[in-house]
Amino acid sequence: MATLDTPPSDTPDQNFLQSGDSVNFDLSAFSPAAAADAEEPVSFAEQDTSAEAVTASVAPDLFGTLAPEPSAEIAPVEETEEEPKFAPGETIHDVATVRGMYQNWFLDYASYVILERAVPAIEDGLKPVQRRILHAMKEMDDGRFNKVANVIGQTMQYHPHGDASIGDAMVNLGQKDLLIETQGNWGDVRTGDGAAAARYIEARLSKFALDVVFNPDTTEWQLSYDGRKREPTTLPVKFPLLLAQGVEGIAVGLSTKIMPHNFRELCKASIDVLRGREVQLFPDFSTGGLCDVTNYNSGMRGAKIRLRATIEKVDKTLLIIRDIPYGSTTTALMESIVKASEANKIKIKKVVDNTAANVEIQVQLPTGVSPDLTMDALYAFTDCEISISPNTCVIIDDKPRFVGVEDVLRQSTAATVRLLERELEIRQDELWEKWHNASLEKIFIENRIYRRI
């Protein structure tokens, strides 16, 4: 039994422990094995000799007959996956093994992320969220600017993943300055500044988007996620939009990273494709700078391009960075310069960011430091030079495919030709119907058929 050893106390209540009281538990009342554990420790040799005697008998502890016979050999149990047993009315969705759930549900999730979230379709070069934004803006279009918050709310009828993803995608489209005309503070890709809140900025479709992106007669439609609305499967884009804008996305097991290309070069290359000539495309960046495309390899997997900032030497104590590499920002570039200076890799006096309409980062040098050597050090140890690995992955026939940018251009050009042919056929049918109706009216009046009615 458990006993309490407490010193005498003058307090009237003797049932509570006082400071300094000790508690002694008689472990032998519970189990001889527990009592043996409570004894003074013995040597390892004594423990080995006594272990056999302890395991030779069944411990009469609190678990009673639950204690296994030590002498009995336990055969290894072979792990086998049992087939799911179905009760009346149950289906595989009600009863499934863990392995089956992993194989089916994870693959379904991965396929959904690839096809419906991260990777663009080759037909129009758009991700689903971008396509739904443009479709919602087309429905709202009356020639005037709309609040971005209003556009986001309209798009949520088609995109079931929340306002944050829609807002980020719309800002990204607006910063490319191709499909959307913007009004207000939409941020700056050069400095890394974010856009203002959606209730403060406005947007509308550009004239270019209205001309080359939309045509309800040649659009294939599908039901929205809740079945209440119609949305386009793909938009009838008559331009290599994917190569003009570029895109970046991360899915389950793969990613895509397509560089933007020059608008005029894409038009010229499309004409060359129609004439059967060989074409070769290289990226073009709105941030300027220098680009080494020696290992571009049509933007396929394993490709690599090097990007450099443009550095101007003003005098012996001043360098000015005029352009920054694509994907970097002036803030990140300045931080990399400061870190390199703190690590004694470059010697600078001060870094000042005077970026306004154009990028201007002043790098002031101490007296006696070579500006040429400092420029080399800036390229070697800072973000004045970075590398990017393109990876052209697009959705073709509902499957992700890795192709080159020239292949994307050829398929886009062929799709544009088919769309134009289809539009001409529709226009021809409309004109024939109009001519036919006009001819019937003429016959009706000239022959005075109305008198017979």
Regions found by a protein language model. Name each.
Residues 61-99, 106, 114, 118-119, ...:
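Long, charged, helix-rich clamp/arm modules that form nucleic acid-engaging surfaces
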Residues 316-354:
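Long hydrophobic segments that form regular secondary structure
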Residues 2-302, 362:
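Catalytic phosphate-handling regions of large nucleic-acid enzymes and associated NTPases
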Residues 274-278, 341-345, 379-387:
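A common structural junction motif
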Residues 238, 295, 305-309, 317-323:
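Conserved catalytic-core segments of large NTP-driven translation/proteostasis enzymes
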Residues 266, 333-336, 374:
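Hydrophobic side chains in well-ordered alpha-helices
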Residues 204-209, 213-216, 332-336, 379-386:
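Long amphipathic alpha-helical segments
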Residues 236-237, 302-310, 341-349:
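Short amphipathic beta-strand starts and helix->beta connectors
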